[in-house]
């Protein structure tokens, strides 16, 4: 089992509100990164990971994955269908991918729990929209396993921000990690991030 990632920087985290779901998100990040790394090495679909990050993630060490996983926001995204009940009628493995189903199920369970306990953290940490939070809260637990078979329900986060993934995989200095942490802990900041990546951090 992967060890719990260390928080990025004490100063940045002390500036954040009380985020009791943060550790759970970081643990899911670590599992998700290892999952994507395996898929890269086996030449499987890597769920939208930007091309520029694939080489670095494919060869990343366990220690680097621990560091990247500690980013205080989900590195994955759930894409819930607008009408969950209709999807569930036909949900089922057309081409079974049990590992993807297991990963999706774990994230769905955690996202639903966070949505029920703290919609604010569900938005900030999981990147969920208000309508998605409402759908998850209304969904019976018995339907989560079936929903996890929905094609495309799980993707990488920040698929349009190659610079962010490159920075995550290359930033080793505390100052660089702190900049990313401060960005991640501002609600709504994701849509304001530049589409073009800034200068690379110094390794």
Q: Across the structure, where does each feature detected by a protein language model lie?
A:
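Intrinsically disordered, low-complexity acidic/Q/S/K-rich activation/interaction tracts characteristic
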Residues: 2-42
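Amphipathic alpha-helical packing elements
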Residues: 43-47, 54-57, 100, 104, ...
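Surface-exposed polar/charged interaction patches
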Residues: 38-42, 94, 114-117, 150, ...
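Intrinsically disordered, low-complexity linker/tail regions enriched in Pro/Ser/Thr
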Residues: 2-15, 62-97
């Amino acid at each position: 089992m992967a060890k719990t990632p260390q928080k990025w920087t004490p100063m940045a985290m002390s500036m954040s509100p009380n985020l009791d779901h943060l550790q759970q998100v970081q643990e899911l990040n670590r599992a998700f990164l290892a999952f994507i790394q395996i898929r890269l090495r086996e030449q499987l679909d890597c769920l939208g990971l930007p091309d520029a990050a694939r080489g670095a993630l494919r060869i990343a060490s366990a220690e680097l994955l621990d560091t990247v996983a500690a980013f205080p926001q989900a590195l994955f995204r759930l894409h819930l269908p607008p009408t969950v009940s209709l999807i569930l009628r036909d949900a089922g493995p057309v081409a079974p991918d049990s590992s993807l189903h297991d990963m999706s199920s774990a994230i769905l369970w955690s996202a639903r729990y966070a949505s029920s306990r703290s919609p604010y953290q569900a938005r900030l940490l999981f990147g969920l929209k208000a309508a998605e939070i409402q759908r998850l809260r209304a969904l019976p637990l018995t339907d989560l396993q079936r929903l996890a078979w929905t094609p495309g329900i799980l993707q990488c986060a920040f698929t349009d921000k190659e610079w962010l993934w490159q920075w995550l995989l290359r930033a080793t200095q505390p100052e660089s990690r702190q900049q990313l942490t401060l960005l991640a802990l501002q609600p709504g900041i994701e849509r304001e991030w530049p589409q073009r990546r800034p200068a690379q951090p110094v390794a």
